[in-house]
Amino acid sequence: MLKVPEHQVAGHIAKDGKLGPLVDDQGIFYKPLQGDARGENEAKFYESFSSNKNVPDNIRGYFPAYHGVQLVEASDGSGQLPHLALEDVVSGYVKPSVMDVKIGSRTWYPDVSEEYFNKCIKKDRETTTVSLGFRVSGLKVFDHEESGFWRPDKRVVLAYKVDGARTALRKFVSSNPLADSVVPDCAFASEVYGGSNGILTQLLELKAWFETQTLYHFNSCSILMVYENDESVDDAPRRARVKLVDFAHVLDGNGVIDHNFFGGLCSFIKFIKDIVESSENCCENGH
Amino acid sequence: MHLKAPEHQVAGHIAKDGKPGPLVDDKGRFFKPLQGDSRGEIEVKFYESFSSNTEVPAHIRRYFPVYHGTQAVESSDGAAMIVLENLLSKYSKPSVMDVKMGSRTWYPEASEEYIQKCLRKDARSTTVSSGFRISGFEVYDHKELSFWKPDRKLLNGIKVDGVRLALRKFVSSNTLSDTSSKPDSAFASSVYGGSNGILTQLLELKTWFENQTFYHFNSCSILIIYENESIQDGDARAQVKLVDFAHVHDGNGVIDHNFLGGLCSFINFVRDILQSSDDQSTQD
């Protein structure tokens, strides 16, 4: 039985009879193949990536597992349509906080249409893409006081400037994201961002690969960050996880590194690192 | 003060049609005319800030020209000039390359007109595709015993393969103007490799760029220099220097991801040439 995913924070949503992704109860995420070249390009990427022997095993874990293209009943009632069958990266989480961050100081790339270029560069300049090398696309964060999710509107998120992005990254690891007038407590910063299995460690592993890989250019791709909030089990681990998603605009690297993604990733890492360090200082000062 | 035009300018402004260009003296100093509009002001502001910034580590300071303040120079009609270290004064036969770093040369604070001009130039060159472009270079030909410079127009149209070829020619000893012979990359390991070579220096710079949030080095170049007089004995005296700070802005707590991405890409190009030349020499 297929249903609309609960935890989508960015991208198309299968709501109100619109075409969008679906999930089953076996941990599979079905993404409808978009009509134009994008769906084809994404499938082509997954085919190439899943059989590429030059991708190290530890890096493969940062990408959703690929289960081919399958015919599935579309969410808008238009019948059986080809869908990309992927690992549902949030299945197995009870109450996940999720954040989608688009990496790179530009979302356009050489040889795109003038129309697409103008659309992209306008958005890149209006958001933090140009200034920070990344932008927050969407997020939902569990609030432990209200027992509900903070899910800012897409328009609010796209209007973030540098401070807004920083605050969102702090709220992402806070127990009180819904409290507007209070400073985010960054209660989970060291468990989620820090630690030997935390987000920062994973990002640094990805960074090392991006310093030399010339296989793919991940134009307009996002990094998804997920962690668990369910406290029904004592000392439940946060299980913070980084995944790369959205490969509709990936191109061959042709012997050149993905300097656009790499620069943005390094900038993102610096932001996370600063939050970890300031939260560690907070604890030392007894706040 | 005896001033003359510098011998080995490979990019940037030169004295032409009555407009002032840079000058050098015989005491190892380089005089750069203060560019009109705000650029000259920005460059001075950067040098003032940088030279007194105690948080810049000593091993990074070596990658920047020493600043000697500003001075009015008579031979240029009393025009104000920035006085810098002449990076080439200690070289007798330097090969020099100017590489503009970053996948974009524009920045948010610039005027719309400037942004559009840069976007066009960036797209036409290897800036967008590779994260850097070669602005110019001059290399000593050990067979012809003279300096060779590629045609400026030719350089503007090169693509990724052209960049690789230029980086190989830059460290070759064979006749450079002869396009039929392959560059021998004879000096690749002396110049690019080794514990004091270009690659080592670039990697040191990269580490600093992964954390520094003081400055955004928009449109800056990396200059690569080495000595031809001693290179046959394996002594390259290779040096990396950052130059051209007319568009530098405050980092405001954000790293210079634009420069860093381009620098990392450039490092890969240099490393590839070094490795393929190492492979070649083990096969010979």
Which residues are covered by each model-predicted region?
Chain B
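Polybasic, positively charged surfaces/segments
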Residues: 1-284
